[in-house]
């Protein structure tokens, strides 16, 4: 949005972001509510104890993107939205959008570079378990990782902020610099690199947990920005078409897939003696169904709703002005 501020007010920006993001927030929450009781298992001990009216209340709060405290949890994972966990990171994106519109868009490259360095220190503080502010002592198995950020507790809020700031400032700085790494078939190489990075299991044993912290820090601070720089210059016709499709699908997939994951976890807990082949079948089915639901939501709901909001809300001011 850096190149649009000469023809867009701050309120226009907020409306554009709401139109882009919020319809699927509502859809993801409604999907999570409809499948909530199908996720009952020992991993989610509170599900069957939750009355229907409480689910309806959480649905309303989720649709409004109102983060709930841990005392209001109805699942057992203390998420800000117990019906659709991934919205915790979207909450941070909303905050980043507000800060960008009010202040950060005016930052120079030097200022962005300084904030990149400062936010990198926060990333290192979490991944290496340095715990400068004394907020990470209760992380347990999540120590030396970036796992966390989805609860309204001091430690989780700190992890959430740490996970937000470096990618946000680094992404904005890369966009401002505009110098991309030109690699032939860069999209495919970048896809391979992302896959390799993400499939790596946790490294280091109980006495060498720091090794995993170093791996995650290097991945976030160096490898992911490099991949973005390498993959942002796609020119091939097929590559552009594939990128366009995946880009359109990514947000609906992100915001709708987790209710199915809850159900998969419940099935695995409730069927501990199921053969490996059945687990594989369930996993593949969840993968395929997640993509199908995301694509259906995109074409049948998200795009039509956004177009309607664009015509009746975003462009309403311009129409009145022209009249």
Place the predicted regions along the sequence by residue.
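Membrane-interface helix-loop-helix regions
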Residues: 21-94, 123-154, 218-231
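Alpha-helical transmembrane segments in multi-pass integral membrane proteins
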Residues: 1-12, 68-78, 102-109, 146-295, ...
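Alpha-helical transmembrane segments and their helix-entry boundary regions
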Residues: 12-13, 21, 89, 112-113
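Loop-to-transmembrane-helix entry motif
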Residues: 17, 21-25, 249-256
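Alpha-helical transmembrane segments of multipass membrane proteins
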Residues: 28, 32, 100, 290-298, ...
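Intrinsic disorder in cytosolic terminal tails and internal cytosolic loops
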Residues: 319-323
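Aromatic-anchored segments of alpha-helical transmembrane domains
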Residues: 34, 117-131, 192-205, 264
